[in-house]
């Protein structure tokens, strides 16, 4: 049967929904948020059949409000990433208000279709949402079980029994978005459908994504990160969910970027000031070819490229002048004679020498540093150039390459500088990573995100304060997040036990409202399993008895596992009529032989 409508009716309903959506955009919840689309574009993609996402919407609304309260009070949530649904429920029951779900644990865990592996986001787009769905389902079940048990308590029992908040306040790992706008939208849609209210998106390049504390990270330009954040917000608006978007940057420890197109990234591009040096790409490929020609056939990356003989000759001559070819020959001879060390390790040693030698001979630096060096020389010679090195440094910190070059021309300064010479064989540009770059990346993302996160190489309050102060100088109400990573060796951070204890509290004072141990649950799971397995081998069933004693001592709900997982709720439908106020029928008083609940004299802990 066809649905009949009139053009007037359709237009009226559409116009009303556009107006309502614009009103939603203008809500104080989104103060300072920029959307690169209109309310009309959102409504055009909603269709006519209403679809509601109650769990995600309500959780997002309440979670955001709570984070705002914490920000205003200079406090924070300190949490970790659970490795199982039981851990997620335990987190909430122990008073930790929010949960982190990271791709690290998802990678390490594997699935029915994916092998366990490192944190490279090499799993399907659906895998983290699938992991999140299990956590959300566990939290909702815990809430139902709690409600059922409390309804069957006396008033005195309810007063003596705390009620826990099992709302799924979760921020989940959206990695790089797994591709373009459509991939980001698909990923956010999956998170919303299963009830997740928060998502973090990072500025690494898909396909080369690394764990935040691994080397070799390749960034995308600032405009690409903004596109991801904007696509996420667009999908949330279509679904009418005020989700919490976290913009993560890896710029503090990254050294590569896949494009120089965005002006905000250009102050951090590295280039050669010795324009006669062979390109880094040519030197690297010549090094690989040298190993290959000496019989190390495992190294053959140069065969991917079509570098000309002239470039190879120039690069090989440079390697020879640096003494690197002689080192290659000695390394290969030693490897062929004993083979005790892997060829990858040996190549890495030579590669490090190549990198250090090339950077030194190339005079690798940013364009701003190249001009500043000339200004300092002129100043030392008593020349009046028109701008001091300090003034230039302040100007060039956020200037595009075009603007910087134009200003240098005005000053009569023209350093030889070429960032193309420093490109890697893959075509990536080298950059000057660090806190200043992370600040620049985050300032660009701030109008499109609810929370900013700078991934760091170690735990350092001074670095955190520098970042927070720079962000809040321009965005005073911007909430921040901090990774309390297990990848750090916290005993080598230089902090005392008391300083480590107060670390999350101090972060809260700076505006870091969501602070998390990414894969803490993975380590808890492993250590607990190792300890119990060891005890079981040594002490037999005494190991279990000791565990049960501990559960009874701390009144853990794990001492009654059937009740914990909802046994009473599961049996309700069979043992009494639907209306709990109605007088039970005689048969309802008889416990069936198939009941999952224990008999009165059973000594089990159910």
Curated annotation (Swiss-Prot):
UniProt pathway: Carbohydrate metabolism; glyoxylate cycle; (S)-malate from isocitrate: step 1/2
Q: Which GO terms describe its molecular function?
A: isocitrate lyase activity; metal ion binding
Residues noted as binding substrate in the record, renumbered to the chain: 102-104, 212-213, 248, 483-487, 518
The UniProt record lists the keyword tRNA processing: no
Give me any GO biological process, just one: tricarboxylic acid cycle
Q: Which cofactor does it need?
A: Mg(2+)
The chemistry this enzyme catalyses reads: D-threo-isocitrate = glyoxylate + succinate
Binding positions (Mg(2+)):
173
The EC number of this protein is 4.1.3.1
Q: Which residues form the active site?
A: 211
Q: Which UniProt keywords apply?
A: Glyoxylate bypass, Lyase, Magnesium, Metal-binding, Tricarboxylic acid cycle
What is this protein for, i.e. what is its function? Involved in the persistence and virulence of Mycobacterium. Catalyzes the reversible formation of succinate and glyoxylate from isocitrate, a key step of the glyoxylate cycle, which operates as an anaplerotic route for replenishing the tricarboxylic acid cycle during growth on fatty acid substrates.
Q: How does it assemble?
A: Homotetramer.
Listed PANTHER family: BIFUNCTIONAL GLYOXYLATE CYCLE PROTEIN, ISOCITRATE LYASE/MALATE SYNTHASE
The record's family statement is: Belongs to the isocitrate lyase/PEP mutase superfamily. Isocitrate lyase family.
- What protein is this chain from? Isocitrate lyase
Q: Organism source for this protein?
A: Mycobacterium leprae (strain TN)
Source organism phylogeny: Bacteria, Bacillati, Actinomycetota, Actinomycetes, Mycobacteriales
Name the encoding gene, please: aceA
């Amino acid at each position: 049967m066809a649905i009949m409508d009139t053009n007037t009716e359709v237009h009226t309903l559409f116009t009303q929904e556009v107006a309502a959506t614009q009103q939603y955009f203008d809500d104080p919840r989104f103060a300072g948020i920029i959307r690169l689309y209109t309310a009309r574009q959102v409504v055009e993609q909603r269709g006519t059949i209403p679809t509601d996402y109650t769990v995600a919407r309500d959780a997002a609304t309440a979670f955001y409000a709570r984070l705002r309260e914490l920000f205003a009070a200079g406090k924070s949530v300190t949490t970790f990433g659970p490795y199982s649904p039981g851990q997620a429920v335990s987190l909430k029951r122990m008073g930790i208000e929010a949960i982190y779900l990271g791709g690290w644990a998802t990678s390490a865990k594997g699935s029915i279709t994916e092998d366990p592996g490192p944190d490279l986001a090499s799993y399907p787009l659906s895998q983290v949402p699938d992991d999140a769905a299990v956590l959300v389902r566990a939290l909702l079940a815990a809430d139902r079980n709690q409600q059922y048990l409390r309804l069957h308590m006396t008033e005195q029992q309810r007063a003596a029994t705390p009620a826990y908040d099992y709302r799924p306040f979760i921020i989940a790992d959206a990695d790089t978005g797994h591709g373009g706008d459509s991939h980001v939208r698909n990923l956010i849609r999956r998170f919303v459908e299963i009830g997740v209210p928060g998502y973090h998106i990072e500025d690494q390049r898909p396909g080369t994504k690394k764990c935040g504390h691994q080397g070799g990270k390749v960034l995308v330009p600032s405009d690409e990160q903004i596109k991801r954040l904007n696509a996420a917000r667009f999908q949330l608006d279509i679904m009418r969910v005020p989700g919490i978007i976290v913009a993560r940057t890896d710029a503090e420890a990254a050294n590569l970027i896949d494009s120089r197109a965005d002006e905000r990234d250009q102050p951090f591009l590295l280039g050669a000031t010795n324009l006669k040096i062979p390109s880094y790409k040519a030197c690297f490929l010549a090094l690989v070819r040298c190993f290959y020609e000496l019989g190390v056939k495992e190294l053959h990356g140069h065969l991917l490229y079509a570098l000309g003989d002239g470039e190879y000759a120039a690069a090989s001559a440079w390697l020879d002048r640096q003494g690197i070819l002689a080192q290659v020959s000695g390394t290969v001879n030693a490897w062929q004679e004993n083979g005790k060390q892997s060829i990858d390790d040996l190549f890495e040693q030579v590669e490090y020498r190549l990198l250090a030698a090339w950077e030194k001979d190339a005079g690798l630096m940013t364009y701003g540093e190249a001009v500043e060096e000339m200004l300092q020389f002129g100043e030392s010679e008593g020349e009046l150039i028109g701008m001091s090195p300090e003034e230039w440094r302040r100007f060039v910190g956020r200037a595009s390459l075009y603007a910087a070059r134009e200003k240098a021309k005005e000053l009569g300064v023209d350093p030889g500088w070429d960032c193309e010479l420093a490109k890697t064989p893959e075509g990536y540009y080298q950059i000057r990573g660090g806190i200043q770059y992370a600040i620049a990346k985050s300032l660009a993302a701030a109008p499109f995100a609810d929370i900013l996160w700078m991934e760091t190489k170690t735990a350092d309050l001074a670095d955190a304060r520098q970042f927070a102060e720079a962000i809040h100088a321009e965005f005073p109400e911007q909430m921040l997040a901090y990774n309390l990573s297990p990848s750090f060796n916290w005993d080598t951070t230089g902090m005392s036990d008391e300083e480590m204890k107060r670390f999350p509290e101090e972060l809260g004072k700076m505006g870091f409202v969501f602070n998390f141990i990414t894969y803490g649950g993975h380590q808890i799971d492993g250590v607990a399993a190792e300890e119990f397995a060891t005890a079981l081998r040594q002490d037999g069933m005494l190991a279990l008895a000791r565990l049960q004693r501990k559960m009874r001592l701390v009144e853990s709900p794990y001492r009654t596992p059937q009740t914990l997982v909802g046994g009473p709720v599961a049996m309700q439908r069979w043992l009494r009529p639907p209306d709990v106020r109605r007088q039970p029928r005689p048969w309802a008083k008889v416990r069936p032989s198939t009941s999952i609940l224990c008999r009165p004299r059973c000594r089990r802990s159910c």
